[in-house]
């Protein structure tokens, strides 16, 4: 039951955010602003609404469907996880107050904090048992997006309401890190939607439910992926009581609309400030800007499925290598990102520490070399300058362009021009993120239609998740290329089980070398994450933390006037 005062506040906030509606990781964030700000040290007062602007809409409110950054921000606020990352990016407890590990490194015993779901139902270890068992049972039917996080779990048990035990078939170095994005769901709600053979879990249209049941610091009161999602404080939350009454997340159709709303005072914070407008925002009085490089890797993805019958030349390592040498990263970074990015060459980023292979470097921009590679391989230019394959097929490809990626069109134009210079024609296909994901997997998760895409991955601190996304068993789940290599998959299993950090690092380096050789992607740049807050807020954390921790939602609050 919602308290009347909170309901009135929430409805008022919703009205404000709707009126404004038009349409990531940093290890060393910096703060800047045009006016004096005491947001770093001021004490927070209880109450109030934080109104946040985004330009990329969530792609689902159902944890078995949603996969993008905004969806995971919502999941992080709504659902318990056993562990989370702290401000130093070290694993700490979330729902778990403490845990122990058996001598054989197979069994984890978690002692849980008492709490309640937002509808008043007790949150217990039975919810964890149900979530784990259900996800594993239906991983090939409807729960594949989340099943990878608990791969290798042999059994789970709940000896009492506040104790949860997970046993793995063999030691797993990645166990705790992978439990961070694995969210515990309310059994009494989700079990009603399992359906025959588990087929209902990813078909449940949760946005039609209105108010949803959550166990985190906030829970969804109203959801609109193209407008405003309102989250209210959960009185039964097991963690520190949040300062805020509610959070409003508004999606804008473009960055200019979001910035206009910010300037007009219609929102309090902007997620992903456009790099072209950062200096303008910094010049505003009483504004705090947090910025820094994030593990967000901008990439070009090839359709790597060998069963695709058209444009099979895109499977040729020579073609992909030539195209990689025709990507002008420096120009993209300066033109599209105003210098606020760094060249990328791996699926991992520096936040992964020693796991990032330092010997891998971006392919040198060299059009002469790219042309020579294609000439030597028998790809000949026609009268119009576009090449044909030895079989006589024209080398002209469609490139899927998700429109929620900053600077996407300009980035594509730079690459398109250089690829044309080496005899490869490309046609951009702009579409929203959900449509782009469907187009890549078409038909039915088989990756038989698309040629290339330009997107990005927001990586995790432990490398396991990013390495998992290109495995054979991620067809129809996390894979966005259709890449499958049994040699790579075998190494993935080895690194996951390797408890010696140095040996695991060596395996992960070898995996990156395979991806560099096979080129399911051309990695372009590691971008900055830039977030802005109006004055009057305290408890602001590093930009990336909102994706991997509830700490930002526990600490942020409005300062006293």
Predicted regions and their residues:
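C-terminal motif of bacterial Sec signal peptides marking the signal peptidase cleavage site
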Residues: 17-20
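N-terminal lobe/hinge region of extracytoplasmic solute-binding protein
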Residues: 53-103, 133, 213-215
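Gly/Pro-rich hinge or "lid" segments in bacterial periplasmic/extracellular proteins
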Residues: 86, 90, 182-242, 246, ...
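Aromatic- and charge-enriched surface segment that lines or borders ligand/interaction sites
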Residues: 97-141, 159, 165, 258-261, ...
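Alpha-helical secondary-structure segments
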Residues: 124-131, 161-167, 216-217, 245-246, ...
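Surface-exposed binding/hinge segments that line
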Residues: 147-196
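Ligand-site clamp/hinge motif
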Residues: 206, 234-280, 413-416, 425-427, ...
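Detector for C-terminal structural segments
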Residues: 224, 228, 235, 295-298, ...
